[in-house]
Amino acid sequence: MKFINRYSAIALAVGLLTLNMNAQAETVSLNTNTASQTSAEIQVLQQGQWDNFNKQHLDAMITKAKQSPAHSYYAVFDFDNTTAFLDIEEAVMIYQLEHLLFAMTPQELKSVIFKDIPAADFSADFNNKDGKPVNIDKVGADILESYQWLYDNYDGLKGDKPLSEIKKSPHYQNFITKMRYLYAAIGGTFDHAVSYPWVTYLFMNMTPEQVAGITAKTIEWQKSEPVEGVVWESPASLPGQAGVVETDWHNGFRLVPEMQDLYQVLQKSGIDVYVISASNLEVIKSIVTQAPYSVPESQVFAMHLLRTKDNKLTSDLDPVYPQTQGKGKTETIRKFIQNKYAGKGPLLVAGDSEGDQNMMSDFPDTEVVLIINRLRSPDTIIGQLSKQAVKEHGQKDAKVLLQGRNDSTGVFVPSQLHTPLGAKEGRALK
C-alpha cells in the first residue's frame, strides 16, 4: 500500500493526551504551568491548556449553578472533535479496515455500502487519479470484487490465510483504500443525513460488546500513533471501474484531559452531563459511560441502530430516535431531556461543527456555549457564533467561548487560536 505523510507530525505533550483504557478510573491530572491565582478568584477547573478567560467563565458558571439543588441544570456535549481530538468513528473505521473486522457476507456488504447513496457522480474533488468522475456504482463494484476475494481467503472470514499473508494481496489494499475513499466521497458530496449514518452500518451483525472491544483497541492503538496527515492510494494493478483513487485523513486520535476534567467537575457540582454524538451509539457509550467521564448510559445519545432478537446490530436506524446531527440534536434534547428539567434548555452546550450549531443556538436560556475552534465558515451559524466569541472575549456577560487548539499536536492552546495541521501560526476566525 502506498502511504504518504503529507505533513510532519509534531509529537508534543503525548503524556498529557494519552489515556489508558485499562486505567480510566485514575484521576485526571493537568499541567498547571500558569501564574498562581489570588485566593479571591474562583478555582474550579484545573488550568490545563484552557484559554484563561474561558476557564474563569466556566468556573463562574459552575459556581453559580452549585447554589441550586443538584440536578437543576444540565450540560450537553458533542463527542468528536469536542470531547476528544479528532473523530472516534473515523479512527474506528481505519482500525476496522486494517484488521478486516467485518461480520457481513459480500451480499450484506453490498446492501450496506449502497444504502441510501444517490447514483450521481461524486463531487469533482473526488475524481480519480486520471481526473475522471466516480460514483457509487463504479467504486461499489470494485469494493465488492475485492471483498469477495478477502471473504473467500482470509481466515477471519471464510478463508484459511492469515492476515499477514492477506495484506500482500492488492485486493486488501484496494478494499481498504476504496472503502475509506467512499466514506470521504459520500461526506463531501451528499447531505449529512446520508453520510453520517452510513459509516455506522459497517457494524452490521456485531454485538454491542464487539463494537466496544474494537473501540477500546482503536484508542489503545491511536494513542501511540503520531498526529499527522496520512494518504492511501489504491493499487494501480486493480484499477477496476473507479480507477485509481486516493484518500486522506488526520491520524492521532486523542482523549482531551481538559474535557475529562470538565465532565468530572460538572457532575461533582450537581450539573448533569449528556452526550449527543453523530457517531455510533455503542462506540460512544463504551467511552463516556466509563471513568473518568462516568456519564450514565441513559444520558448518552448517538446514531442508534436497531438490533436483532439475538442483540446484533442491523443497518437500520431506530426511528424512535432523531438522527443525532444538526437539527436532530435539538430534537433529541426536546424529546428526551428538556422535560426532566422543567422545560429548561441546557446550561452549557459544547461542540465544534455545523452538526452542533442548532443545539448551540436553539435554547434562549443556555448560559454558555463552548466552541472548540476549527475555523468554521462565517456563512454558518457556528461561524457567526465564533465571531461573537471573539467580540465578547474578556467581557463579564460573554455567552460564547471559543477555545483554541493545535491540530499538529492534538492539544488545547491557552488562547482562542486554531492552528490547522501543518500550519505554523494560528488564527481565531476563518
Question: What annotation goes with each model-predicted range?
Answer:
Residues F3, Y7, V14-L16, A23-F79, ...:
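Non-catalytic pre-domain segments flanking phosphatase-related domains
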Residues A13-L17, N22, L150, N174-T177, ...:
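Short intrinsically disordered, low-complexity segments
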Residues E26-H57, T63, Q67-Y74, G188-A193, ...:
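C-terminal cap/substrate-recognition subdomain and adjoining C-terminal extension
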Residues D78-D87, K158-P162:
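N-terminal low-complexity, Ser/Thr- and acidic-residue-enriched intrinsically disordered segments
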Residues T83, A91, S377-P378:
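Glycine-rich nucleotide phosphate-binding loop and flanking beta-alpha elements
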Residues M93-A184:
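Conserved phosphoryl-transfer catalytic core
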